[in-house]
């Protein structure tokens, strides 16, 4: 029972470590796995090439505490490898620890908010896509967050609360006190698979300071075919101390977006396509159509080609800004990915 609970409840972290993760240690109810990926990614816009390659490395540790209770810790970091100013940067993607059992799993640290599982309905491409169902900060991957997830038969639920970051008032005298940045918030989501119909429904909500949004999603699987859609609506704070920045906006603006996705698996080849559209304050801020093909040489090694048709035109207005020629370019991406 203990081993079954652990296997089920850390499934999200197991996906991150990958099916090919190496078991470094497993003894007396304690285990440590290592996984990651090495991904070579070429991006071409207007005939100009950029190296967007990256490598990820992660560790998943688990320990049985008693019957029906376990401890878990997870870390994942990412390096970009291009020879430029960002080439030596380490992005600490995940760092969290917590407790789990029949009740689900509770963690604290840097982890995913509750809306990532909703955008995953349409975030299925090897490179492009997922550009319209934009998550506010508290619903995305963020630190200083308490998270809960649970799986109950066909129903999965997630909830997270991000604490406001502490700072001092910098008065440099006896009146100096602790303050916070006011960026606390929460996110909630639920996903339900309807029997053996192939139909799955999802929904979620997030709120942080002056920003908020809700999302609705649905998917249908029929053999080798997969179809999905996501809709989001809410408000984003582009103000001076807001969570977002855009040269065309300077206050709280309405945001509406939707994504459509389809996938067809043919042997070792997977074809995917997505359409993304979003409006900010009534202006079309995202409009693109993407297609890709991925070939799996082995389950842990794949190659792909992806093309994004940018449907925005240079000269179009977004708020008080104008879309540049660079912002309106299409993009071709070629990649090879090795999972370990």
Curated annotation (Swiss-Prot):
The keyword Membrane applies. One of its GO terms (biological process) is monoatomic ion transport. It is a multi-pass membrane protein. The keyword Transport applies. Pfam families: Porin_4. Gene3D superfamilies: Porin (2.40.160.10). Residues 1-21 form the signal peptide. InterPro entries: Gram-neg_bact_OMP (IPR050298), Gram_neg_porin_domain (IPR033900), Porin_dom_sf (IPR023614). Belongs to the Gram-negative porin family. Homotrimer. This is Outer membrane protein U. It comes from Vibrio vulnificus (strain CMCP6). The gene is ompU.
């Amino acid at each position: 029972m203990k081993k079954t609970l652990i296997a089920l409840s850390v499934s999200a972290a197991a996906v991150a470590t990958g099916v090919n993760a190496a078991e470094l240690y497993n003894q007396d109810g304690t285990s440590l796995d290592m996984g990651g990926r090495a991904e070579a990614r070429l991006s071409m816009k207007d005939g100009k090439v950029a190296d967007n390659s990256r490598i990820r490395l992660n560790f998943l540790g688990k320990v049985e505490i008693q019957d029906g209770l376990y401890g878990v810790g997870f870390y994942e970091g990412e390096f970009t490898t291009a020879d430029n100013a960002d080439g030596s940067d380490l992005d600490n993607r995940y760092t969290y620890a917590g407790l789990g059992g029949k009740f689900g799993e509770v963690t604290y640290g840097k982890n995913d908010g509750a809306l990532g599982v909703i955008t995953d309905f349409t975030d299925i491409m090897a490179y492009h896509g997922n550009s319209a169902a934009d998550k506010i900060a508290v619903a995305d991957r963020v630190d200083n967050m308490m998270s809960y997830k649970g799986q109950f038969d066909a129903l999965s639920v997630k909830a997270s609360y991000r604490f406001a970051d502490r700072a001092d008032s910098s008065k440099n005298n006896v009146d100096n006190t602790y303050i916070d940045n006011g960026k606390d918030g929460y996110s909630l989501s639920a996903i339900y698979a309807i029997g053996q119909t192939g139909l799955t429904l999802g929904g979620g909500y997030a709120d942080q300071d002056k920003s908020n949004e809700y999302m609705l999603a649905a998917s249908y699987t029929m053999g080798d075919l997969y179809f999905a859609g996501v809709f989001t609506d809410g408000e984003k704070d582009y103000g001076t101390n807001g969570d977002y920045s855009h040269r065309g906006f300077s206050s709280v603006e309405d945001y509406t977006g939707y994504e459509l996705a389809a996938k067809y698996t043919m042997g070792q080849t997977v074809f995917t396509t997505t359409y993304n559209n979003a409006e900010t304050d009534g202006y079309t801020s995202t409009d693109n159509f993407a297609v890709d093909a991925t070939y799996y040489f082995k389950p842990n090694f794949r190659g792909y080609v992806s093309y994004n048709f940018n449907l925005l035109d240079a000269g179009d207005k977004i708020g008080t800004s104008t879309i540049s020629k660079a912002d309106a370019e299409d993009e071709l991406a070629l990649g090879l990915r090795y999972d370990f």
